[in-house]
């Protein structure tokens, strides 16, 4: 007959079970096989400050030279064609300005930042930078207007896809203004 003490005792500890540490996962040199070709990585060790010794890994896009700090940023860029926007943290009352920042900075700068918050975010690009068509033929229509229709073989490309291509072309050419592409 049991007096109930065997149920009140905690289970014995198992010293063979490893303890999970909360340390930050470090990237290994060979884990970049998810990166597209020609992308390069750079590993830097911080040499000063409170975070001295921390290893930072940067990813560089080959055409624009844009620097990314994380795999998530690179994947977002590859999927959308634009870098991830920094999130704007708001106070509990929904006001984007904290009490600490009131009265600081020029009125012009504050007006400009308020304007940015109210503008709708740009539509993300729906363009696959890794699987571009091999050959696209552009046919001009309505000679007086500058209207062009893209074709791949005999297949006419949808207007929405053509608009996405136009936005990507504008983005890439504006980023590379003054740089030699080839």
Swiss-Prot record:
Broad class of where this protein is predominantly found: nucleus
InterPro entries: DNA-bd_dom_sf, Methyl_CpG_DNA-bd
CDD domains xref list: MeCP2_MBD
Function: Transcriptional regulator that binds CpG islands in promoters where the DNA is methylated at position 5 of cytosine within CpG dinucleotides. In addition, binds specifically methylated m(5)CpNpN but not m(5)CpNpG (N is A, T or C). Plays probably a role in gene silencing.
Name of the protein in its database record: Methyl-CpG-binding domain-containing protein 5
Region (Disordered) location: 1-56, 80-126
Gene3D superfamilies: Methyl-cpg-binding Protein 2, Chain A (3.30.890.10)
One annotated GO molecular function: enzyme binding
UniProt entry tagged with the keyword Nucleus: yes
Tissues expressing the protein: Mostly expressed in flowers, and, to a lower extent, in seedlings, buds, stems and mature seeds, but barely in roots, exclusively in root meristem cells at tips (at protein level).
Domain MBD: 25-101
Domain of life where this protein originates: Eukaryota
This protein's UniProt keywords: Chromosome, DNA-binding, Nucleus, Transcription, Transcription regulation
Organism: Arabidopsis thaliana (Mouse-ear cress)
